[in-house]
């Protein structure tokens, strides 16, 4: 794609973050805004916990874990609301850095948005690594985290259960587009795609 774009005269400026002024200075006819996304804050994660940084997004945790090679005693809990290949690659990384891993999802299975053949491979790899998978549940309270426990609630029956020996909690949540440039560009009269 890069080579084809170059062939058709697309100019790339890499290694810097563009501001609206940078884009406007180029006097474009249209702007294709492809600025990525960030993880949203799941409903079970209140603002205080979110601001503390103690329950990072799976992307944030993966970046941290890639810098380390030690193994942490205890269970990492990955709350899966994303259901993409990225989530399960991070679960595999967690299995290398923690003595136990549990994936929690409110859906009836993991990998809901992944093709069947890929999902089968994901299940095989996760089970080979001893990853526990809990379906139809979601976190209901973070109050017991100080005691290394996470309370879950069944989304159908309301029955609760505890995960014990919790050393870390992370979430793979819906993504929110990084579209801060959209409004200033549209206000300047540009068509933003």
PLM feature spans:
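N-terminal Rossmann-like dinucleotide/flavin-binding domain of flavoprotein oxidoreductases
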Residues: 1-25, 114-140
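Rossmann-like dinucleotide/flavin-binding elements
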Residues: 13-26, 31-48, 52-114, 146, ...
């Amino acid at each position: 794609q890069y080579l084809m774009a170059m062939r058709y005269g697309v100019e790339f400026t890499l290694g810097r973050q563009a501001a609206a002024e940078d884009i406007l200075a180029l006097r474009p006819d249209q702007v294709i805004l492809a600025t990525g996304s960030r993880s949203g804050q799941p409903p079970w994660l209140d603002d205080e916990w979110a601001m503390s940084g103690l329950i990072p997004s799976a992307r944030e945790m993966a970046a941290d874990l890639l810098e380390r090679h030690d193994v942490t005693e205890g269970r990492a809990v990955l709350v899966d609301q994303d259901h993409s290949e990225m989530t399960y690659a991070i679960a595999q990384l967690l299995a290398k850095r923690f003595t136990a891993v549990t994936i929690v999802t409110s859906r009836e299975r993991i990998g809901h948005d992944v093709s069947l053949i890929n999902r089968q491979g994901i299940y095989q790899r996760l089970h080979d690594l001893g990853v526990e998978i809990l379906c139809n549940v979601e976190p209901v309270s973070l109050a017991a985290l100080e005691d290394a426990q996470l309370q879950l609630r069944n989304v159908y029956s309301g029955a609760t259960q505890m995960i014990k020996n919790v050393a870390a909690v992370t979430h793979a949540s819906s993504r929110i587009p990084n579209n801060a440039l959209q409004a200033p560009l549209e206000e300047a009269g540009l068509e933003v795609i």
